[in-house]
Every structure is written in C-alpha cells, then in structure tokens.
Amino acid sequence: MQPAMMMFSSKYWARRGFSLDSAVPEEHQLLGSSTLNKPNSGKNDDKGNKGSSKREAATESGKTAVVFSLKNEVGGLVKALRLFQEKRVNMVHIESRKSRRRSSEVEIFVDCECGKTEFNELIQLLKFQTTIVTLNPPENIWTEEEELEDVPWFPRKISELDKCSHRVLMYGSELDADHPGFKDNVYRQRRKYFVDVAMGYKYGQPIPRVEYTEEETKTWGVVFRELSKLYPTHACREYLKNFPLLTKYCGYREDNVPQLEDVSMFLKERSGFTVRPVAGYLSPRDFLAGLAYRVFHCTQYIRHGSDPLYTPEPDTCHELLGHVPLLADPKFAQFSQEIGLASLGASDEDVQKLATCYFFTIEFGLCKQEGQLRAYGAGLLSSIGELKHALSDKACVKAFDPKTTCLQECLITTFQEAYFVSESFEEAKEKMRDFAKSITRPFSVYFNPYTQSIEILKDTRSIENVVQDLRSDLNTVCDALNKMNQYLGI
C-alpha cells in the first residue's frame, strides 16, 4: 500500500447592482494566522504615530463607482461628465449600455477615484440631470486588503512556493515508532541529510544531485523490477508511452536512482511541470498550491530497505514511478493543475474536498481503455499489492463523481474500500471543473504562464488582460486555419 497525498467578488458586484458568484496575500505568516492581508494596525509612521488601518485611508480617497441613466439625446452625456470634472473626480473607466428599464434611455457605468466628500457632492448634482441606478459610496469602497483579509493565504508567484515546501507536517527526519526505520540510526541520519537538502532548496536553484548508497539503490531496484512486470497489463497507455522516455532521458533503470534535476528538466519540456524537493508530508493546501503552478513537490529519500515493497509515507520510489510518467502527459498535467488552481483561497472544507478528489484520482484513479480497467493513480502504480487488487474482481469500483467521491474516506495503511473510474482524463477534468464552481471564493484566479504568477480576476480591467492573451491565441489559430484553407484547400 502506498501513501498518497471565473468568479468575481460577489461583494464588489452586488454594490453595483449585479449578482455574480465567487483572494489574496502580500505577506504569509508561517506560524499562527493563516489569513491574508491584515491591515497594518501596529506599525508607526514617520512621525511616530500609530499606523491607521487601510480601511480608514480608503475612506478618505479610493475607488468607487456609480451607474446612472440618461435620455438618449445629444449632449446628455457631456453634461453629466462635466460634473465629474467640476468636482475633481477622476474617471478610471466608463461603459455604456442600453437601459433595461426604458428603451429611450442609456445607462452609464463610471469607475472613479475620489474622496467621500467629493463623491457625495457629485451625486447631489447628478440627481438633477440623471437617474441614479446604483452607486458604491466610499465607505463601502472595495479594497483588495479588506475583501481578502479573511481568505487563507496562497502563493501569488512561483517563488513563494518556498514558504509552502518548508512546512512539513510529519516524518522528515523525525520518524514515528511504527516506521520501519525508527530503530535504524544510520537510516535516521540519512533522512536528516535529505531534510537538510530540501529545506535548503530555493526556487530557481538546480536541484542538488544525490549520491545514493548501495543499500538505497538496491531497494529502488527491487521496487523498479517488480513493478515493471505489472505495467504492461495494469498501467494506462499514457503511462506506458512515457515510461520508456524516462528510461532514455532520465536514467530510469534498476541499478540507478534518477536525479530530480534530470526529471524536472524532462517534465518541463513535455508538459510544463517541474519538480522540487520536499522533506516529507505537506498539508493539502500547500501541496495543491504547488500544482497550481505546475510544480510537484517530490521527496528524494528512499524507503527503508527492510521492507522494499512497503512505505508509510511518500518516498522517491512513489514519486518517480507513480507520479512522474503521467505528469509528462499534457492532458494529465492540465487536470492536475486545475485541481491546484481550484484550491487557491478556498475554505478549509473545500480544500479537503479537493484533496479527497485528488486522492481518488491522481493517487488511486482508474480509467477505461479498450474496454479494460487501467490504473493511472500514482498510489496504485507504485504499489505491487494494491495495483493487483484494484484491477481484480475483489475491488469495489465506482464511477468518478466529485460530489460523492469527496465524501469517501481516504485510507493510508490498508487498501482503499472503493476506487473510482473515469472514461478518460478529459472526462475527469470536466467533472472537476463543474465541481470547482461549487467552491465559494470571492474571486477567480488565472495562472499567467509568462510571469509564473497568479492573477486575481476581480474587475473588468483584470479580466481585460486575460482577454488580450486569449485574443492573441485565437489570432494564431485563425491564421493557421486560413493557411490550411489556402494551401490544403480545406
């Protein structure tokens, strides 16, 4: 048995008269509070005064909005906008649309920056010339810090994964009494070495190469040899496609433990994923956050040699033989990333549901290929006994449905009571997308692959940047189609 492991701010738009569904830090407190962007209430300013909160500052001057309607006549809009100029209200964004109330009127949406006094004076003047549909006064100004202060922290850029990877929950150099290596002082010292390597690693550095001992290589060899016998009849086709490539480019052999740096470079070229070393178990939130960046946290230590076919924790045999071959598949990589993206800023309850779905798909998932059940879960593909069991008549197999799968108990030291099957990765991905819509968040997230950062989609301007990227991609597709029409006569 192997161990495992576009929504907008509803408050923002409700103040504008809309109803839309569903976060974010600057600093992450490693210990203690797990929420974000707390207002500064303890620092002194340059004059020695106690720092006032960002909420108070926003009341004096900040972003606000108003929607008003005008008769559809010449000069009406000019007169209204002149009032903004007179009251020195800066217009940041303006939109117009046909009124839903009267066909003879047009509604104007204005996003602006001003103080409370100026805004109130502007509204009084607008009332004489327009009909106010909805407004967002400065005392209710939306600010990212206020809106997201109760949202659990998550990394906004890939380098912040350094914080996640150092918060190991269990094992590392400290082993439980029932661990096979608990009484082996040599093994415990070796584990401490791997902890030091992982804790010292920073984003952007090459992953340190490890000189594995003869005992470690022998243990790896036993696992590699026995599992390789089962893969042709038990593993999914995507796994079987990539496994020989790992042998060719990353040194996957019975007598050699692959190096994470070589594996990471291989994955980067195949699917955009990379790996980074980790000392042991991470919390579901921290682990899934890595997937959002297409980063897989990977251990470097080898299980204890006294029982090569069992480990109570994820080791490098589990990571390299179970996870890596499928992370090289673009569709599987996207499926993994979308689970990670859905977890960012989600509640503890929703993260646990996502982690359970992850457990029964990416760790213990089954799929159908050519009418036969095949394994794609890493926990199965790195466990001889459970791989045989999951594809036998003795296993309880159910159709994958995130709504029910998330309620299934995850078992660590025994075989699972149930396994979940999907027709394809694409089907599982679509089901997870639908399930993610039920997660309550006051925002949506977008992974920017160019800056390797997470963008918060909270207003029309932030969405516009994403649309620009999509437009560029669509132009490329249209150009390709035009050339096919021209040269191939399609």
Swiss-Prot record:
Pathway: Aromatic compound metabolism; serotonin biosynthesis; serotonin from L-tryptophan: step 1/2. Residues 31-58 are annotated as: Disordered. It catalyses: (6R)-L-erythro-5,6,7,8-tetrahydrobiopterin + L-tryptophan + O2 = 5-hydroxy-L-tryptophan + (4aS,6R)-4a-hydroxy-L-erythro-5,6,7,8-tetrahydrobiopterin. The modification Phosphoserine is found at residue 19. Residues 65-140 form the ACT domain. Coiled coil: none annotated. The keyword Iron applies. Changing residue 36 to V: Does not affect catalytic activity. Brain specific. GO terms for cellular component: cytosol; neuron projection. InterPro entries: ACT-like_dom_sf, ACT_dom, ArAA_hydroxylase, ArAA_hydroxylase_Fe/CU_BS, ArAA_hydroxylase_sf, Aro-AA_hydroxylase_C_sf, Aromatic-AA_hydroxylase_C, Trp_5_mOase. Disulfide bonds: none annotated. One of its GO terms (molecular function) is tryptophan 5-monooxygenase activity. Gene3D superfamilies: Aromatic amino acid hydroxylase. Changing residue 328 to E: Loss of activity. Transmembrane segments: none annotated. Interacts with DNAJC12. NCBIfam families: Trp_5_monoox. Belongs to the biopterin-dependent aromatic amino acid hydroxylase family. This is Tryptophan 5-hydroxylase 2. It comes from Homo sapiens (Human).
